């Protein structure tokens, strides 16, 4: 791989047995810190799910160590070049699950999962009739970008997906089901759950959106918008052939791909908005959040009560 930038961002996961996640997490954090990596890694008895950044040399050492650990034999790293770190700190945390589905009866992807489709096969499958494409991510991820024709489940988090499927059975019955997510980890369990629910033709995008966007053959075609990522980059491009903006400004509905968090820390909702509207609406999604005494935009910009009142008056006048 020809390297043109000094840093890399690694994205990876593996379902494998880790006997003592707490002990492993502590040791792994010390190892990552010794390499001066930054990122967020989740560890559970069922495996590991991580994304981290570092220099080319640091990430090479990390991948070498992981590949030399028999527990992670065959692990696949998705690699992005970067100009600098994509995280501020390094966290390695033990968790009950790698992805939070909270099923009554958990799914082991080694025992049951949907059929893996490589990018070219997934591309062809999306164009077939009687196919339903389900986005297995959160609503704010979908709003920034998704495959053409994909269904956006009316959910706020991944663990709500099984209930949504049960409530919308008529949309899926008798259809070929395609599922996708950012890197593939959510679909390993979700597609397996669909198979267990009795759906016969279930496939998943192998390696997720990130792999699809890098594939030299499909080049991200049939993807609109950008892909939401859980680091300081926030969004990465997918479609190498054309860039269609699907995100809409929370306040005006105009095309927008810039995410901010609502300035009220008790809300923290992710909203798409321009820099102009961020200033106009005090980076807040509602009147209640604008007048919150903890509004971070107001505090950060040291706005006076008079300035806040003037901003609120301007918003009211524009309605």
From Swiss-Prot:
GO terms for biological process: tRNA modification. The keyword Ion transport does not apply. Its EC number is 1.14.-.-. Keywords: Oxidoreductase, tRNA processing. SUPFAM superfamilies: Rhodanese/Cell cycle control phosphatase (SSF52821). It comes from the Bacteria. It is an enzyme of class 1 (oxidoreductase). The keyword tRNA processing applies. Residues 127-221 form the Rhodanese domain. The active site is at residue 181. GO terms for molecular function: oxidoreductase activity, acting on paired donors, with incorporation or reduction of molecular oxygen. It catalyses: uridine(34) in tRNA + AH2 + O2 = 5-hydroxyuridine(34) in tRNA + A + H2O. Pfam families: Rhodanese, Rhodanese_C, UPF0176_N. Belongs to the TrhO family. NCBIfam families: PRK00142.1-3 (NF001135). Catalyzes oxygen-dependent 5-hydroxyuridine (ho5U) modification at position 34 in tRNAs. This is tRNA uridine(34) hydroxylase. The lineage of its organism: Bacteria, Bacillati, Bacillota, Bacilli, Bacillales. The gene is trhO.
């Amino acid at each position: 791989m020809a390297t043109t930038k000094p840093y890399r961002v690694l994205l990876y996961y593996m379902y494998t047995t880790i006997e003592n996640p707490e002990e492993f997490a502590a040791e792994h954090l010390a190892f990552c810190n010794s390499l001066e990596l930054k990122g967020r890694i989740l560890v559970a008895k069922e495996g590991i799910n991580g994304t981290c950044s570092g220099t080319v040399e640091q990430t090479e050492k990390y991948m070498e160590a992981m590949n030399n650990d028999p527990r992670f034999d065959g692990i696949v790293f998705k690699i992005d070049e970067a100009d600098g770190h994509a995280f501020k700190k390094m966290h390695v945390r033990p968790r009950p699950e790698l992805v939070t589905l909270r099923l009554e009866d958990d799914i082991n992807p080694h025992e049951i999962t949907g059929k893996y489709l490589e990018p070219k096969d997934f591309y062809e499958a999306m164009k077939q009739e009687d196919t339903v494409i389900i986005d297995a991510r959160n609503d704010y991820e979908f709003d920034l970008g998704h495959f053409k024709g994909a269904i956006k489940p009316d959910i706020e988090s991944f663990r709500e997906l099984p209930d949504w499927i049960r409530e919308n059975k008529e949309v899926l019955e008798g259809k070929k089901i395609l599922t996708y997510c950012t890197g593939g980890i959510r679909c390993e369990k979700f597609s397996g759950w669909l198979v267990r629910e009795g759906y016969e033709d279930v496939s998943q995008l192998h390696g997720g959106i990130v792999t699809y966007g890098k594939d030299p053959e499909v080049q991200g075609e049939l993807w609109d918008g950008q892909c939401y990522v859980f680091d300081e980059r926030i969004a990465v491009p997918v479609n190498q052939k054309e860039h269609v903006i699907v995100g809409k400004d929370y306040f005006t509905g105009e095309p927008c791909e810039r995410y901010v968090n609502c300035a009220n820390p008790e809300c923290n909702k992710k909203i798409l908005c321009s820099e102009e509207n961020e200033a106009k609406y005090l980076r807040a999604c509602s009147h209640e959040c604008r007048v919150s005494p903890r509004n971070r935009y107001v505090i950060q910009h040291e706005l006076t009560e008079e300035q806040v009142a003037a901003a609120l008056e301007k918003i009211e006048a524009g309605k």
